[in-house]
Design a protein with these regions (language model features):
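A charged alpha-helical hairpin associated with nucleic-acid processing machineries
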Residues: 38-39, 82-89, 105, 127-289
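Phosphate-handling DNA/RNA-contact segment within nucleic-acid enzymes
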Residues: 1-145, 161-162
């Protein structure tokens, strides 16, 4: 144990007390480890991926919160990516370790991961909280850029993470764009399937208004009355989040034209616009639920 006491190993989150008697066991046994560093290049925790495809435990686990590790204040790979983020002017934000590693190996250096898996119980690996972008992580990114590009998984959980990421980025007065993956279930797979296309999709990331319109009109039949109602409901909610009144006005007019409905009706149905935001980045504004 390299001279550390059992209590210190447990407090550091790398070991757990045995339930079968005295002693401890390795929290990350039989797992591939991903060291997690803070922005000052100090190792503060680990992520672990199971090596057994038939394992009943969770595929990924993270270190628990400790005296030196709080997942809300750490972004995986930010210690290496921060200079590239400054140079490019934006950060690509993904969900997991492998998303970062595959992208980094492919030459995409301004990339970080939220890596938000957390154990509900120290001993029950099958119970997990969902991954998600945290407001503190957004504040951390704002030190290095004024724009983020969200590139989360293509499943429902990834879509939910994108929606929350949009709200948090707007709350922090950051520009936010969405990378719409046309291949692969996640950035890791997309980078390995067709790197050129993946890089193009990052470069051509869509502003949130454009992304919302593209997504809705792809899924909803707006030729029907019910389809028009569904599209209007979703897109008006998205438009209401836009902080710029000129941008909101532009998209309301566009929606009226695309749905062939009266602009006045849409304006009457528009949720209340966001309240003026404070310039103090440390204060959470009304966009954060």
């Amino acid at each position: 144990n390299k001279g550390f006491s059992l209590e210190e190993l447990i407090a550091a989150g790398v070991a757990l007390k045995s339930e079968r008697g005295p002693g401890i066991y390795d929290r990350f046994r039989d797992r591939l480890l991903f060291p997690i560093f803070d922005v000052q290049d100090r190792a503060v925790g680990f992520g672990g991926r199971t090596l057994d495809p038939n394992a009943k435990e969770a595929k990924y686990i993270n270190s628990p919160q400790t005296a030196i590790y709080n997942k809300s204040f750490v972004l995986y790979n930010l210690n290496q990516a921060k200079s590239f983020i400054k140079d490019s002017g934006y950060a690509v934000v993904v969900e997991g370790y492998m998303d970062v590693i595959s992208s980094w190996q492919a030459g995409i250096k301004n990339i970080v991961a939220v890596s938000g898996t957390a154990l509900v119980s120290e001993t029950n690996y099958s119970k997990e909280e969902g991954s998600g972008f945290k407001y503190e992580q957004v504040k951390l990114l704002k030190r290095y850029c004024n724009e983020i590009r969200l590139c989360f998984d293509a499943d429902l959980a990834g879509q939910s993470a994108s929606e929350r990421g949009i709200d948090l980025a707007l709350a922090a007065e950051l520009e936010v764009k969405i990378v719409a993956l046309s291949q692969g279930k996640d950035p890791d797979e997309a980078a390995r399937m067709n790197l050129v296309k993946f890089k193009q999709e990052i470069e051509q990331a869509l502003p949130i208004g454009e992304y919302a319109f593209k997504s809705v009109f792809k899924k909803v039949d707006v030729k029907t009355r019910e389809g028009k109602k569904q599209a209007a409901k979703f897109l008006l909610a998205a438009i209401a989040k836009l902080p710029d009144p000129v941008e909101r006005d532009f998209y309301i007019k566009r929606l009226a034209r695309d749905l062939d409905v009266e602009e006045k009706s849409l304006r009457e149905s528009l949720p209340n616009p966001p309240k003026p935001r404070t310039n103090a980045i440390g204060k959470v504004n009304c966009l954060v639920n």
